Amino acid sequence: MKVPRLIVAGTESGAGKTTITISIILKLLANQMKVKPYKIGPDYIDPQFHRLASGVPSENLDLWMMNDDQIRYLLIEGSREFDISVIEGVMGLFDGAGSDFTGSTYDLARRTGTPIVLVIDGYGISATAAAIVSGIKAYAGELLRGVIVTRVSGESHYRLIRDAVEEKTGVPVLGYMIRNEKAVLESRHLGLVQAYEIDEIREIFGAIDSSTVIDMHQIIDIARSADKLETLYSPEIERLGTFKVSVAMDSAFDFYYEENLRMLKRMGASIRYFSPMGNEVPDADSDLIYLGGGYPEVFAGKLQSATDTIEAIRHAASIGTGVYAECGGYMFLCRSLESTDGHIYGGVGIIPASVYMDASLVIGYREISAKRDTSILRAGETARGHEFHKSRIRFDGPYDHPFVLKSRSSSFEDGFSSGSVTATYAHIHFLSNPRVAENLLIA
């Protein structure tokens, strides 16, 4: 299948990938094109910016949580009703699991035949940009189809970089972004701020758009040159019945993989969103309450005041309604929760544990295996996901955790499971094991 697409990659984190991705999306929309965004890697936050810019959900593509055929499947299925797909890379172009580039943005590009547009930071350099691009071209080869330069001081600065790069490397330079303090995406303790928390986000997007000059004809031509995608993969998903799933969705809880929600729907779930921040309650006849990750530690005071939400979740758990929580949702279910400013607030209280904040970030891929039967995995079953948090959970007494999380260098116990309630720090991608979604609905 022909899927016009390109990858926006960077020389490093902070080069401006997200900003340029947003700019390209906005300019394609202005050209009356339907745009489908994707993000390489497990990150939840960049896709929120993509969604706000494009108006449609952005999906994650990850070579550790998925195999090649699943990646192609997501690209084919997700792009069917769109004119072009824009895929934002992760870290630097070649940064992955090792020196062979496994799991990197480049790795996904070569496995899917997707052309690359490279973003380089032009601040403080001119002809040196040619050496940077030359080195990257030596590894990326013909997949490298263009360059966009960020943080240039003006058009004359841009021309110096453009002329050097094109003369020395033969790689076309497609445009630039002027330094503009109004076109900056803010940051927070875990990375980029959640998109809808930024004040006047539309004004920021407008500043990004007006600060960038990009040859969109070349962008479109590059995307249309991408290899055809073929796959025999189709997830073995059957409709299991009719289910009601209540999903927490607001500024405290909004880290969900789009494919996870879609898989639940394919199995027969109708999804209704509720806001703990707004003291809303899940449907009383829910078969499952799904509490995803987010930033409950930032909003702990307001969440403590959400007494209707808290009581509804407690009641649901007491009558055997399925409750599944990941990371931030896991924290919210605990007895107490420390906020980012050091205050202690009450949580739902169905997990006998307290949450405290730590200076160090826990981050990385995880293989999760069940030590005993739970509502997401039966004993011995495994799935894949990742962790990304600064909090820690301390149980009130000795507790036999239901899961073992394995990283590249170690393994450790995690999570909570009792009755119909299951929680883990891991953000699991259901495509790594569709049994997770099935178990949740028929538990």
From Swiss-Prot:
Pfam families: CbiA (PF01656), GATase_3 (PF07685). Its EC number is 6.3.5.11. SUPFAM superfamilies: Class I glutamine amidotransferase-like (SSF52317), P-loop containing nucleoside triphosphate hydrolases (SSF52540). Its cofactor is Mg(2+). One of its GO terms (biological process) is cobalamin biosynthetic process. Pathway: Cofactor biosynthesis; adenosylcobalamin biosynthesis; cob(II)yrinate a,c-diamide from sirohydrochlorin (anaerobic route): step 10/10. InterPro entries: CbiA/CobB_synth (IPR004484), Class_I_gatase-like (IPR029062), CobQ/CobB/MinD/ParA_Nub-bd_dom (IPR002586), GATase_3 (IPR011698), P-loop_NTPase (IPR027417). It catalyses: cob(II)yrinate + 2 L-glutamine + 2 ATP + 2 H2O = cob(II)yrinate a,c diamide + 2 L-glutamate + 2 ADP + 2 phosphate + 2 H(+). One of its GO terms (molecular function) is cobyrinic acid a,c-diamide synthase activity. Keywords: ATP-binding, Cobalamin biosynthesis, Glutamine amidotransferase, Ligase, Magnesium, Nucleotide-binding. The active site is at residue 327. The record marks 427 as: Increases nucleophilicity of active site Cys. PANTHER family: COBYRINATE A,C-DIAMIDE SYNTHASE (PTHR43873:SF1). Comprises of two domains. The C-terminal domain contains the binding site for glutamine and catalyzes the hydrolysis of this substrate to glutamate and ammonia. The N-terminal domain is anticipated to bind ATP and cobyrinate and catalyzes the ultimate synthesis of the diamide product. The ammonia produced via the glutaminase domain is probably translocated to the adjacent domain via a molecular tunnel, where it reacts with an activated intermediate. Catalyzes the ATP-dependent amidation of the two carboxylate groups at positions a and c of cobyrinate, using either L-glutamine or ammonia as the nitrogen source. Belongs to the CobB/CbiA family. The a and c carboxylates of cobyrinate are activated for nucleophilic attack via formation of a phosphorylated intermediate by ATP. CbiA catalyzes first the amidation of the c-carboxylate, and then that of the a-carboxylate. This is Cobyrinate a,c-diamide synthase. The gene is cbiA.
